[in-house]
UniProtKB/Swiss-Prot annotation:
Listed CDD domains: Cas2_I_II_III
InterPro entries, A to Z: CRISPR_associated_Cas2, Virulence_VapD/CRISPR_Cas2
The entry's keywords: Antiviral defense, Endonuclease, Hydrolase, Magnesium, Metal-binding, Nuclease
UniProt GO molecular function: metal ion binding; RNA endonuclease activity
The species this protein was found in: Thermodesulfovibrio yellowstonii (strain ATCC 51303 / DSM 11347 / YP87)
The protein, known as: CRISPR-associated endoribonuclease Cas2 1
Amino acid sequence: MRVLYIIAYDITDARRLGQIRYFLKGYSTGGQKSVYECFLEREELKFIISKIKRLINPNEDRVHIFRIDGRSKVITLGIAVPPIDPEYFYIG
């Protein structure tokens, strides 16, 4: 079962920043700059955590992963759209 996670990061090095941004875009259904909405299976989450641990410098970088309860009401403002778990993902 897919669960919605918000992954936010603050990476100090431009090279590492690019690597993490490129990696997370493959799993995200939405987001903006350094915050991504990702619907993940448990194994995908484990893989993402292990990959990010290898990419970051733990003394300089910061990554937060928030599990969003599906029963919670989503409030959107402005042109924001509520996150939707897509039926299919395109990888290519």
